Amino acid sequence: MTYVGQSASAAQQSVAERASVKDVLAAYVGLTKPRVIELLLLTTVPVMFFADRGIPELWLVVATVVGGAFSAGSASVFNCVYDRDIDEQMRRTRRRALPRHIVSPAAALVFGFVLGILSTVILYVWVNPLSAALSVAANAFYVLVYTMLLKRRTTQNIVWGGLAGCFPALIGWTAVTGSLSWVPVVLFAVVFFWTPPHTWALALRYREDYANVDVPMLPVVAPAREVGRQVVIYSWVMVATSLLLWPVAGTGIFYPIAAGVLGAVFLLEAHRMWARSRDTESLSVIQPMRLFHSSNLYLSLLFVAVALDPLLAG
C-alpha cells in the first residue's frame, strides 16, 4: 500500500472513530428525550415569570432549568431502560439507543442515576429544598408508578401517569416563592387535562405499535370514535381549567383573552378529529397528528401567555 493509500485509510478510520464517539454521545442525549425536556421546561420558566410578577433572577432561572432538565432526563433514561424490550418492537422507538445496542442497560442506569443525583443537588443547593423534593417526587412517580405499574396494565395509564409531567408547573412556582398555593395547582391541572388528548392523538397514530407490544393505550382497546369523544371531553375540561387562573391568580386581561382564543382553536381541532373518526378507522382520514401538533402549540402559547401577562400588566 502506498503512503497516500495508508494516509487515506488512516483518515477513514479516524473519521469512523469520531463518528462512533459522536453516535454514542448522541445516543446518551437521546436517552433523555430532549423534546420532552423542552416541553417540561416550557411550563417551568413561564410559571417562574408569573410567580415573580416580572423577570426572575437569571441565576435562579438557570439553576431551575438545569436541575429540571437533569431530573426529566433522568426519568426518561430509566423509562428507556425499563421499556427497552417493547422499544425494540415499535417502529417509533426502535431507533433509540438501547434497542440499537449503542448504550448498554447498565451504562444507561448509571447515567440515569448520575443525572438524578445532580438534579437533586442543584435544586436543593441553588434553588430550594421544596423544589428538589418535588423534582424527586415527579421522577419517582414517572418511573415507579407510570412506567413500571400503569403503562402496561391499564387504559388509564397516561391519565394518571401523566401526573408526573404536571410537576414542572409546581417547581417553577416554588423556585421563586419557596411555597405552594392554588395558583400553580391550577396550572398543574391544566397540564393534567392536556395530557390525554395530546398522548391519545399520538397513540392513535401508532396504535398498531402499541397493540403489537400489548400496551393497552385507549386507541388500542377502543374504536377511534370513542377516542375522539374522550379527547373532546378532556379538551373542554382543560380549557375551562385554564380560565380558572384568571380569578384564582388575579391575572391581567391579557391572559384570559389569550387562553380563550387558544382554547377555542384547540377545541375546534378536537371536535374536527372527533367528527372525522365517527365513521372510519382510517388514520389518513382521522389525521390524529394534526391534533397532536396543535396540542404542542396550544400548551406552548398558553404558557407564553402566562409569562407575558404580568409583564404587560406592568
UniProtKB/Swiss-Prot annotation:
GO CC annotation: plasma membrane
Subcellular location: Cell membrane
Pathway named in the protein's UniProt entry: Porphyrin-containing compound metabolism; heme O biosynthesis; heme O from protoheme: step 1/1
EC number per UniProt: 2.5.1.141
Any one GO molecular function term: protoheme IX farnesyltransferase activity
Catalytic reaction list: heme b + (2E,6E)-farnesyl diphosphate + H2O = Fe(II)-heme o + diphosphate
Parts of the chain that traverse the membrane: 58-78, 107-127, 130-150, 173-193, 227-247, 248-268, 294-314
BP term (GO), one: heme O biosynthetic process
Bilayer topology: Multi-pass membrane protein
Keywords associated with the record: Cell membrane, Heme biosynthesis, Membrane, Transferase, Transmembrane, Transmembrane helix
Additional record remark: Carbon 2 of the heme B porphyrin ring is defined according to the Fischer nomenclature.
Job of this protein: Converts heme B (protoheme IX) to heme O by substitution of the vinyl group on carbon 2 of heme B porphyrin ring with a hydroxyethyl farnesyl side group.
Family note: Belongs to the UbiA prenyltransferase family. Protoheme IX farnesyltransferase subfamily.
Protein name per Swiss-Prot or TrEMBL: Protoheme IX farnesyltransferase
Gene for this chain: ctaB
